[in-house]
Amino acid sequence: MKKKLVLIIIDGLGLRLESQGNGFALAKTPVFDRLFQEYPNSLIAASGQEVGLPEGQMGNSEVGHLNIGAGFVVYTGISIINNALKTGKFFENEKFILAFRHSIKTGFPLQIMGLFSPGGVHSHQDHLFALIDFAANFGVKKLNLHLFGDGRDVGPKSIKPWIKMLNLKLKNYEDYKIASISGRFYSMDRDKMFDRVELGYNALLGKAENTFTDPIDYINFQYEKGVSDEFFEPAINLKVNKKDFLADDHPVIFFNFRPDRARQLSHLILQTDLYEQKPKNPIKTDVFVSMMKYEGINCLVAFEEMRVENPLGKLISMAGFRQLRLAETQKYAHVTFFVDGGVELELENSDRILIDSLKVQSYADFPQMSAVEITDKLLEVGQNYDFIIMNFANPDMVGHTGDLKATIKAVEILDFQIGRICKWAEEKNFDFFITADHGNAELTEDENGNPSTKHTTFPVMLISSDKTIKLKSGKLANIAPTILDYLGLDKHPDMDHDSLIIKDK
């Protein structure tokens, strides 16, 4: 008899012993308590080199889901680019050189934009510094930087020291300037909130209500208003000539390597077919370079990604299982695009259900997000499928607010939903595995008691509903082989990691 299985991916829920600032440990979680006490479980590494990131680098949702589906460690953006820097290949990149030559030939400024922080989730400031050096050494005379405040993968108000470092570098070059500043809330939305994105886009064009002559002064002004890095209101530098802001035929480099929050802004610049929304102030450029491939965006790509040819979902489909992917908007791409290897796969006998995420400024005010609706939908249609991958976004998205009380509430709401799924699974003869893609909710305060809004390097859980098996510890790349093993299916030779189910000798 074919087994039926649900893989529940809890976004941003790591395991940490200390209780201070721990939204998981401080929450009332009778369901999780029972699962840990009575069911097979183990620890899963979800950060650093274990998931293809630099040593000590916190995990993230994209990398986590890629590794979960791949069955091997997937080296992604930051590792690929860092290696190019290490070997010197970065400074031979033909796509960058093409953009530089276009700037030199036309006399138009090189426009470089991206998330400015050492967070390493969507971008890294070291890559920007390297680009500036590369452009200068190649002979680019005029360069404009369009910086997006982070405040999420790093501290909420942490950008000033890095801006000061950047200013020191820019002093070496007469026409290299910070042309605009905006928060990632505007420039890196992924939830089709184009009213926000257009404000960030307009700042690239030199159109914004807010202005500055000194970036540090503007940051201080925003802080005085209670605005953190993530939410910086788009502003432009009055010292930059109006004609030097982004315009027709200007070369552009977008130094974000992670695609999901880069696609909407890229779409507005390039006017692709990816979304219906069109910019009110369109421009045209044929020289647009992305660090890595942004799915659906036709542009020059600086670095090729590692390919996942035979992900878990593809093998499940080939085995004749009817499968479902279920998540809310914030994590829908992760249970489809990313877990399928970073491509849009059309799998036989496979359905996708998207539950709309609440359109709010802060999930701290709505820690339930769409967890109840996701569970309701599973209970409504789940019995029609053999294999289900689903995601709960609460711990991650609420954890990003740094609000401990809200994070505790999010975890408690999630615990209740997991309880509903446990009951349903037993009634419908389903088994389940519960894991997470990375940590977050378990650390909402730093060592000084200030809010921590970033991911963590703590391990995550793997829990099985089947009391007849035993699990050993591993990493996210072990999960696909474990599921295939449990379902009695062979893993693909590409999957060089083993099942975590302990076999009797």
From Swiss-Prot:
Lineage: Bacteria, Bacillati, Mycoplasmatota, Mycoplasmoidales, Metamycoplasmataceae
Cofactor annotation remark: Binds 2 manganese ions per subunit.
CDD domains the UniProt entry points to: iPGM
Protein name: 2,3-bisphosphoglycerate-independent phosphoglycerate mutase
Keyword Hydrolase: no
Broadest EC class assigned to this enzyme: isomerase
Cofactor: Mn(2+)
EC number(s) per entry: 5.4.2.12
The organism's place on the tree of life at top rank: Bacteria
Keywords noted in UniProt: Glycolysis, Isomerase, Manganese, Metal-binding
Catalytic site: 61
Residues noted as binding Mn(2+) 2 in the record, renumbered to the chain: 11, 61, 437-438
Family: Belongs to the BPG-independent phosphoglycerate mutase family.
GO molecular function annotations of the record: manganese ion binding; phosphoglycerate mutase activity
Catalytic activity: (2R)-2-phosphoglycerate = (2R)-3-phosphoglycerate
This protein's pathway: Carbohydrate degradation; glycolysis; pyruvate from D-glyceraldehyde 3-phosphate: step 3/5
InterPro entries cross-referenced by the UniProt entry: Alkaline_phosphatase_core_sf, BPG-indep_PGM_N, Metalloenzyme, PGAM_B_sf, Pgm_bpd_ind
Record NCBIfam families: pgm_bpd_ind
